[in-house]
Amino acid sequence: MLLDNDILVDAGTGVADLSLTELSLIDHVFLTHSHLDHVASIPFMVDTVGGMRDQPLTLWAVPATLEILRNHIFNWSIWPDFSQIPSPDKPFLRYREIQVGDTVELKKRKVTALPANHVVPAVGYHLDSGKGSLVFTGDTTTNDPLWAIVNKIANLKYLIIETAFCNRERELAVISKHLCPSMLAEELAKLERSAEIYITHLKPGEIELTMQEIEEDAGQYRPRMLQNNQVFEF
């Protein structure tokens, strides 16, 4: 998800849809967690545009996620350590830690890390322009601490929330700490703010079924499927 031209939230395979110019304008990447579908494009992105930029690309994530990237991707075995090249004092990549509750302010926009409940350390993000807010839950299952915070966001306009499994796979959703439509309905019942709700993280082979079940279980909240290249103004 691209915020304006310079902030990216997660870096999955969809980043490949961006042009070289668009990639080069991104200064900050806020990661929700370390799973491959959320970090896969970072190595190629840094390698592609690092030499075109006059400052490092900054990765923001919880300490556990940054440690995984250092140890398992940017380790010289899988990919070069771009936090050390071309030189340690002028690298292509730099790491910055963020914890739940921390807010980073970038050109009057605020990015705040939200609690997530997943199988690895993870966060969601609250993006606040000052005029409006968008909440992206990231990968999560049942998450009461999230709603306690979201319900205090007075200018909330959009909520993007995952639903990774259909109802017949509820047990798998519980084990893997995701949501299915019946669980989504239980979570949305905790939302006390008015917001447009969009569904993400749908499995490609189950999109139609899952969205049908979402309509049946949570239709009163009017959730819609997040579309490629969808634009939100806030």
Give the ranges of each region predicted by the language model.
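Metallo-beta-lactamase
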Residues: A64-A122, G130, Q220-E233
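Divalent metal-coordination and catalytic microenvironments
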Residues: M1, D10, H33, L69, ...
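Anionic-ligand binding region
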Residues: A122, T140-D144
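Cap/insert and terminal regions of metallo-dependent hydrolase folds
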Residues: N143-V231
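Active-site beta-strand termini and strand-to-loop segments that position acidic
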Residues: M1-N5, L106, H126-G130
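Pre-active-site segment of Zn-dependent metallo-hydrolases
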Residues: M1-S34, A40-D54, P145-K152
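Structured loop/turn residues at beta-strand edges in well-structured enzyme cores
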Residues: S24, P91, R109, A154, ...
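Active-site neighborhood of phospho(di)ester-bond hydrolases with catalytic His/Asp-centered motifs
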Residues: V9-G12, D27-D37, W60-V62, V135-T140, ...
